[in-house]
Every structure is written in C-alpha cells, then in structure tokens.
UniProtKB/Swiss-Prot annotation:
Keywords: Metal-binding, Nucleus, Ribonucleoprotein, RNA-binding, Zinc, Zinc-finger. The keyword Zinc applies. Pfam families: zf-U1. GO terms for molecular function: mRNA binding; pre-mRNA 5'-splice site binding; U1 snRNA binding; zinc ion binding. It is found in: Nucleus. PANTHER family: U1 SMALL NUCLEAR RIBONUCLEOPROTEIN C. One of its GO terms (biological process) is mRNA 5'-splice site recognition. The keyword Electron transport does not apply. Belongs to the U1 small nuclear ribonucleoprotein C family. This is U1 small nuclear ribonucleoprotein C.
Length: 152
C-alpha cells in the first residue's frame, strides 16, 4: 500500500486515505510548515529580483534615478507667465496670473459677487443626507391611517 508523502513536512503519513491526509493538513505543525515554506519562497524571489535589478543597473540597462540629480542648473529658468497665455482652469481670461481661481458651480465658475452683496452660502450635503430641496419623504402606507377618535 503506497504511503502519502507531505513535501512541506518532509514526512510520510501512515496511510494514503483522504481522512488521514485531511487530518494531517488541518494540523498546526503542517500549517506552520506551509507558512514557512512560502515565506522562504517569497524571500528568495525578492532576492532574485534585487540581484537581477542590480546586474541590469551595472550593465547600463537601467538609467540612474532622475530624482537624485539635484536642483536644476542656474542658467535654465522658467519664463514668467504672460497675458498671451491661455487662462488656467477656473480663471476668467484677462485675470492676473496670481489671482485665485473662482469657485466652481454646477455650470462652471460662479460670477464674482456684486458690490454690497454677500457671497452665496456653500451648502454641501453631508453623508447620508438628501440634497437641498428634496427634504424627507413621508413613509409609504399600504393601509389607511388609524382614526384617533372613533365614533361610538
């Protein structure tokens, strides 16, 4: 009668019956051995990836990290913004470059408030609350409501 060999535990089981294998595979030592086996396998894979990356870098197949190059050279400068450039999102054409973008409404940016008027309140519904204007819906009743003063 052939015996069952467990690769994780490096041992032979007494019988090759499904019940013996099931009992063995649900045991604490077997589960620990399986966990250790895969931890070791993952460490080997990670080390292999590190070695392959290092070898490729040394062979010149991987460019050095561009973020470790340091600050840009002083003779290269970014041109200042001009009025000929298109406006940023949320900006009205012709606004100065340092001005903050306008508040966004459902149909685009809100117009600036008129002199002497307060800005509109920012009403944002909270989680689980219906949007403004909908309010609470009355419950749906399948029967007529009970009468409070029945006539006797």
């Amino acid at each position: 009668m052939p015996k069952y060999y467990c690769d994780y535990c490096d041992t032979y089981l007494t019988h090759d019956s499904p019940s013996v294998r099931k009992t063995h595979c649900t045991g604490r030592k077997h589960k620990d051995n399986v966990k250790f086996y895969y931890q070791k396998w993952m460490e080997e894979q990670a080390q292999h990836l590190i070695d392959a990356t290092t070898a490729a870098y040394k062979a010149g197949k991987i460019a050095p990290n561009p973020f470790t190059a340091g600050p840009p050279k002083p003779n290269i400068s970014i041109p200042p913004p001009t009025m000929n450039m298109p406006p940023r999102p949320g900006m009205i054409p012709g606004m100065p470059a340092g001005a903050p973008p306008l508040l966004m409404g459902p149909n685009g940016p809100l117009p600036p408030p008129m002199m002497g008027m307060r800005p509109p309140p920012m009403m944002v519904p909270t989680m689980g609350m219906p949007p403004m204007g909908l309010g609470m819906r009355p419950p749906v009743m399948s029967a007529a409501p009970p009468q409070l003063n029945p006539k006797s």
